[in-house]
């Protein structure tokens, strides 16, 4: 067994097969692959493709509808639960007494902002909630008490309580219950712990603990007479603070000017008045209508000029921002176009590899076809000679050599044609990618000076900030123009490249179909050999 295995013929390695095929003139695939020049764009395209979300089955939705009324604690925190249980939903509306909703409108809850509608002795910590309870003990200094009787304690300083008997400390609260008016003064509470000195109420019943209000009389009678100082007691008239003064000193609406001293009086040491003012001084109390019209016109013109300057600067700032945004979008479009063109270059390289592999496959298929024909001839009957006619051996050899030569030339032509197309595509894509859309620093310097000199025609009292904005606007517009030209070139290059690759893809498709047919025919011929 060992001796037989030792003398058994070994299988040839791949390298030996390649050498044997090369020795007989059969084309083989070389290990020296072409270096990729757009491999980075291929990796970028693969990363972008991997970043896309994949499709998956729908299931495990944590926000699905849950049947109400269950008493488990694993419910949807956002589902509407109408049962009597307490769930983890902080925003649901529940009618239970121990609901944890701080925003619901429950009867008795811990809502600091909700309106309590209960009639029992509940307590609400809401500092802003309007209550409908009666007999409210409140410290609201601004609240209005308008309701019936209940018993509820609240600490809201702004709440509106609706009670008849208000035990309030509000110095400004006003009651709407009116039982009459006596003598022009009133009390605003039936049994008030503190009188409101500013309320305009209408109650007539007085309390022993109330104080006289000096400003509570309604402003219906205007009179400047006052008989009891500031008191608003049993008097026939009250002081109206809103009345228009009718005193003599308020009749003159024009400013009073000091009379100038007569220039005819001799100025000597005896009649010299040191307190006298010589010349007409400017009165700061003059009305605007009495200012000279020329001065008003000058001031209005100056204001209009300043307003125009501000408008010009504002428009310039808007133009700068607009050009910046446009330049940013142009740069983004340029980056996107460059990446797209680079991915087209990587695609062109892969198309070239596919063309080379198809060409090699066609050559191998032709060789396989010849081998199948030879095998069929050798498998004939022993009575039929397999060597052929010995008298035309030289002519058959010449025909075979001519056929091999033609096949080799055709293969070389196709390979060179593919290489030329690949080189043209590579150069076209390189030119589109390496095209610089910006100019050098020297060009930008002279261009800025030229733009600044041209901008002086429509500038008004410009400063350094205006000059900088004009330079930036001109520079941004120039760069936008350069990017627009580059984008146009990228678009044309991509269009040409896509058309070229479409043509190559059609050729690859035709070659692949032809190769498939030839392989199928060789397989059928091998199966028919017996």
From Swiss-Prot:
Phenotype of the disrupted gene, per the record: Leads to defects in secretion of degradative enzymes and defects in hyphal extension.
Biased composition (Polar residues): 142-160, 203-228, 258-268
Keyword Transport: yes
Domain of life assignment: Eukaryota
Listed GO MF terms: SNAP receptor activity; syntaxin binding
Keywords attached to this entry: Membrane, Protein transport, Transport, Virulence
Domain (t-SNARE coiled-coil homology) ranges: 313-375, 467-529
Compartments where found: Membrane
Biased composition, class Low complexity, residue ranges: 61-100, 122-141, 161-202
Protein transport as UniProt keyword: yes
Biased segments, Basic and acidic residues type: 8-22
InterPro entries cross-referenced by the UniProt entry: T_SNARE_dom
Membrane-topology descriptor: Peripheral membrane protein
Reported function: Late secretory t-SNARE protein required for secretion and proper cytokinesis. Plays an important role in the secretion of virulence-associated extracellular enzymes and vesicle-mediated polarized hyphal growth.
Family classification: Belongs to the SNAP-25 family.
Name the record gives this protein: Protein transport protein SEC9
